Amino acid sequence: MQLNVSGAQAIEVSERTFGGEFNETLVHQAVVAYMAGGRQGSKAQKTRSEVSGGGKKPWRQKGTGRARAGTIRSPIWRGGGTTFAAKPRSHEQKLNKKMYRAALRSILAELVRLDRLVVVADFAVDAPKTKGLVAKLDTLGLKDVLIVTDGVDENLYLAARNLAHVDVRDVQGSDPVSLIAYDKVLVTVSAVKKFEELLG
């Protein structure tokens, strides 16, 4: 299949990488797994044995007419412990490499279908200046965009750092969440070739 390149000749790309069907279930699974992996998992609550105090029986067992109680830190008391207290844990979800790559292929193919993938021969800025990058994006009519390059471009990264709706990634730093988060994805021809190498 062919991909149109902005201001240049169309390029031949792999049907497998850029022309497959959209697997919504798999993409959803990949996005959830990716976001779960980013969770800190450090929340913690205290059980009745961990809450401070409550060592003394508040009143005797029998004869008061009140319900029996052994501690003021029982979960049914105000200020008591939590019955099933949350503890620090990993929220990581397993996703096979094969599935992860298939999800990325599915996203790329859908971006092509929805006309959200913009391919350019090359994309760089002369200096790490936001103004220069904004002007360059304006000529392409792009506002909310993820820029994907073949390798890390320091100038481009620094120029985009102050823009809320622009992000810069290299091919290996691209993930399911970033690829679907922006209105448009701007990729260079060399990045397209790299995607084919990694996902083909």
UniProtKB/Swiss-Prot annotation:
Any one GO molecular function term: rRNA binding
GO biological process, one term: translation
SUPFAM superfamilies assigned: Ribosomal protein L4
InterPro entries, alphabetized: Ribosomal_uL4, Ribosomal_uL4-like, Ribosomal_uL4_dom_sf
Highest taxon above the source species: Bacteria
Gene Ontology terms: cellular component: ribonucleoprotein complex; ribosome
Region Disordered: start-end pairs: 38-65
Pfam families: Ribosomal_L4 (PF00573)
Keywords tagged on the record: Ribonucleoprotein, Ribosomal protein, RNA-binding, rRNA-binding
Family: Belongs to the universal ribosomal protein uL4 family.
Function: One of the primary rRNA binding proteins, this protein initially binds near the 5'-end of the 23S rRNA. It is important during the early stages of 50S assembly. It makes multiple contacts with different domains of the 23S rRNA in the assembled 50S subunit and ribosome. Forms part of the polypeptide exit tunnel.
HAMAP family: Ribosomal_uL4_B
Subunit structure: Part of the 50S ribosomal subunit.
Name of this protein: Large ribosomal subunit protein uL4
Organism expressing this protein natively: Pseudomonas aeruginosa (strain LESB58)
